């Protein structure tokens, strides 16, 4: 972020938390003589200034630098238009690194960066996308947590499956194949994933998505966070359940997706993502404060 010449937050963290960081001006009224000297005992209004809060960001500078460098290299190697990355501490959900290739560096030439197409926004929280197969982890977690399968259970997975009048196939042609639950997700099988989702049922799967925070902002201390998109259960059409378990028909931000994996890595405890310590910050650590039990938690 950046502050203006008068010390007000202009964008980024400094803008979102301007009232926290700025403090409150003080004031004092006192009579003075004709030559400008203060007259003792004439103070009528004396309110001391209040300092702004001391805040320490959770970012690891070395890791942030490394991630930014790797991000730029990956973008160049792949020919992508943009790239972004988020690294969370699995136990606390503290943001250890958050990098984008298209955000303005507040310490650089702002005008030049704008001409290059860079933006003031932070795409890791403001640019939702359809996650696709990376969101199949939600189906996997829900199926195992609810006892409809186990990691080593063997399934006969056909090459396609009929869902609400439509036919969904895997990315590769195959006849009936034997896959364990682990193998279904290792191969990223659409068909196998939908088979397990059907065992969960639509209502349970909707609760699962909601519990993992899909369609809900994380509440991170940064401006312009998007909620993403999750169709309301009452608005589901016939094909909705053929899409959601394989990461289609919904959108998430990169931070939301990272948070889903954080919850799983933390044994099912979802800690709200934190960007700074201090000013009331508390460690979640997978405990009950600020944590929700997943799948299907609050």
Where are these regions (language model features)?
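Flexible glycine-/small-residue-rich
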Residues: 1, 59, 89
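Beta-lactam-recognizing serine transpeptidase/beta-lactamase-like catalytic domain environment
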Residues: 34-44, 89-133, 138-298
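Conserved, well-ordered alpha-helix/loop/beta-strand core segments that scaffold catalytic motifs
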Residues: 40-83
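Small/polar-residue-rich segments within soluble enzyme cores
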Residues: 1-52
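Short beta-strand scaffold segments in enzyme catalytic cores
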Residues: 85-87
């Amino acid at each position: 972020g950046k502050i203006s010449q008068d010390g007000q937050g202009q964008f980024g963290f400094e803008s979102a938390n301007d009232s926290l960081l700025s403090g409150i001006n003080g004031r004092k009224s006192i009579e003075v003589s004709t030559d400008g000297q203060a007259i003792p005992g004439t103070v009528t209004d004396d309110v001391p200034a209040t300092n702004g809060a001391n805040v320490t960001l959770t970012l690891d500078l070395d890791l942030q630098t490394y991630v930014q460098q790797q991000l730029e290299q990956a973008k160049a190697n792949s020919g992508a238009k943009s790239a972004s990355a988020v690294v969370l501490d699995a136990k606390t959900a503290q943001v250890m690194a958050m990098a984008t290739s298209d955000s303005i560096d507040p310490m650089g030439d702002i005008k030049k960066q704008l001409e290059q197409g860079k933006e003031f926004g932070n795409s890791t929280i403001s640019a939702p996308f359809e996650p696709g197969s990376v969101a199949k982890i939600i189906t996997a977690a829900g199926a195992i947590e609810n006892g409809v399968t186990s990691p080593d259970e063997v399934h006969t997975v056909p090459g396609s499956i009929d869902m609400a009048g439509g036919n969904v196939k895997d990315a590769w042609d195959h006849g009936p194949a034997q896959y364990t639950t682990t193998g279904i997700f290792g191969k990223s099988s659409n068909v196998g994933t939908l088979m397990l989702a059907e065992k969960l049922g639509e209502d349970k799967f909707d609760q699962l998505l909601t519990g993992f925070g899909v369609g809900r902002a994380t509440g991170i201390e940064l401006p312009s966070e998007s909620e993403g998109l999750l169709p309301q259960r009452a608005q589901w059409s016939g094909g909705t359940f053929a899409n959601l378990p394989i990461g289609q028909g919904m959108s998430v931000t990169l931070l939301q997706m990272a948070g889903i994996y954080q919850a799983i890595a933390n044994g099912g405890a979802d800690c709200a993502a934190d960007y700074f310590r201090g000013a009331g910050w508390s460690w979640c650590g997978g405990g009950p404060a600020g944590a929700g039990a997943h799948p299907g938690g609050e």
